Amino acid sequence: MLDLSQTIEKVGEKMPWPPKVFWVGLVVYYGFVALCWIGEATAGINHIPTAAFWYASFLGTFLIPLFMSIIYFYFPEKAEEARGGS
């Protein structure tokens, strides 16, 4: 029977911590928000109340999970198929 430390080691072998998808998502999320803030300030429309909240919440709710799932699951699956894997 495995003790807790061996179980944690086995889980760690399969998934790096924190996952790369977390860091990529963090950069995409805050990078997009920063670009939107810069765009608002440059265009002079930064007077819209809670605009940053709404586009950041839209991005975090709908787009980042989609991008991350494509990057982390679709591309590796296609690469595995191209290498002749099952």
From Swiss-Prot:
Top-level taxon of the source organism: Archaea
Protein's UniProt name: Uncharacterized protein AF_0970
CC terms in the record's Gene Ontology section: plasma membrane
Membrane topology: Multi-pass membrane protein
Compartment(s) where it occurs, according to its Swiss-Prot or TrEMBL record: Cell membrane
Keyword field: Cell membrane, Membrane, Transmembrane, Transmembrane helix
Membrane-spanning intervals of the chain: 21-43, 53-75
